[in-house]
Structure formats: C-alpha cells, structure tokens
C-alpha cells in the first residue's frame, strides 16, 4: 500500500490461486456492504442532526456512486463528524475511508480469464456490478512456456501446438458486452 500527501493511494491484494474474479469481486462486495452501512446510519440519524449535516448526508446518499463528489463531501463531513459527540457519528467516522467511491480493478492473465478462472469471471460480468477488469492477453499460457490456450488465435503455432491451433480464439470482449 502506498499513499500520497493526503494519506491516500492504491492498494493491491492478490490470492495465491487463479481466483482473481472471485477475490476482487469479494473485495468489492465487502466495500459496498460497509458503504451501505454508512448510508443506513445516515438515514437512521438524519433527524438527529442539524440541517447542514442532514444536507451532507442526503448529498452523500444521492451521489454515493460518484468518486469526485463523495471525496468533496468526505472532506467536509469528516471534520464535522469529529465535532459531534454521538455514537452514530463515531460509527461513520470509523468508516471514513469508505465514504469515497473507489475504483475496483480485477486483473489477471489470459490463462486465468479464458480458462481456469472463466467461471468466476463470467459470474462477475453477469452481476453488472461497478468493477473494472483488465486481462493481460499474451495469447498463450506464459507461465508454462507458451502452450496454446483458449486465447490463442486459430492457426497459431505454440509449444505443444506445432501444427497450429485448430479452433477459434474465445472472444472474451464480445462475451463481456
């Protein structure tokens, strides 16, 4: 984890298995559960705060899927929460890192995306959740010395496929649409 001058920055996590989709999706679902908890706490306590704070709560709820706006609201809301001496303000303050809508990325190679991890990838795509997926497509299994894979184009010569791959490459981009 590395941070900028504001103490913010990208984080990286990976699993030892070819389950990038499931792992990344689980991280996304976990973050969204915490953000839903923030929203619920705001909604339950809207009538216990002054109008300015209630307006911030409403603004955050209305814009919770927008990174730039949630950052702006967070910058105003966190110092305000620090000044309140209530359990609900402390609960939201404790979850302040989740006030900003993050950008969730799931990354992996073509062996994962086209083959061994395709079931998980298909599940993530079908969920229609707001995650980004990056597939590094070398068109062969790079970790095995270049064997042909489902991402290898028709006719390509690769290790253990010296006469060329006989079937068409899986069209992952079309499947994702």
What kind of feature is each model-predicted range?
Residues 1-21:
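Terminal amphipathic helices with adjacent charged low-complexity linkers/tails
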């Amino acid at each position: 984890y590395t941070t900028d001058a504001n103490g913010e920055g990208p984080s990286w996590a990976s699993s030892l298995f070819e389950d990038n989709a499931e792992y990344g999706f689980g991280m996304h679902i976990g973050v969204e559960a915490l953000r839903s908890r923030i929203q619920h706490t705001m909604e339950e306590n809207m009538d216990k705060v002054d109008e300015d704070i209630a307006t911030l709560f409403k603004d955050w709820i209305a814009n919770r899927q927008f990174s730039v706006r949630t950052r702006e609201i967070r910058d105003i809301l966190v110092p305000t929460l620090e000044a309140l001496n209530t359990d609900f303000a402390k609960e939201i303050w404790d979850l302040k890192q989740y006030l900003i809508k993050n950008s969730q990325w799931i990354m992996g190679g073509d062996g994962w995306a086209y083959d061994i991890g395709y079931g998980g990838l298909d599940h993530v795509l079908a969920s229609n959740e707001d995650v980004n997926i990056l597939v590094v497509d070398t068109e062969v299994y790079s970790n095995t010395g270049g064997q042909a894979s489902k991402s290898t184009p028709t006719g390509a010569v690769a290790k253990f496929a010296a006469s060329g791959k006989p079937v068409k490459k899986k069209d992952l981009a079309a499947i994702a649409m």
